Amino acid sequence: ISIIKQNGFKQVNRIVNSTHILIKIPEPTQNQLNEFAGETKRIERSAISRIARIKSDAIQRIKAALEREYIEPHVAVPAKAHLENIQQSAVSEIRLIGLKKRKTLLGRFFSYTDEEEKKLGKKLEKSPHNNLFSS
């Protein structure tokens, strides 16, 4: 218990007749919440980047298949368009989920960073993602 208290946890109690310890964890500070929101934004950008790489790889495979005549152009063109639609849908979902997580983390301290995020916020209100991360 003393080691736990030395590491900054002030409310540490041993539960009577048990080997369990009850530790009261303090609420995060505003700076910590901002760091969490920043990390959420970073994860969001990383996921969008991975999706772009996946799409690029798939398009390269389609081009290679066209060059080797494994597939016909009338098949490749809709496939590329479908990939584009899938990417746009995935990016939209990632942004909605990221926005909801930041709103949940920051609570009343949340503010939109730009007009695009404001539009996304209006879309989020009508989205099933609005129920995510509710406490």
Describe each model-derived feature in a short phrase.
Residues I1-L33:
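Ribosome-associated translation termination/rescue signal centered on the conserved GGQ peptidyl-tRNA hydrolysis loop
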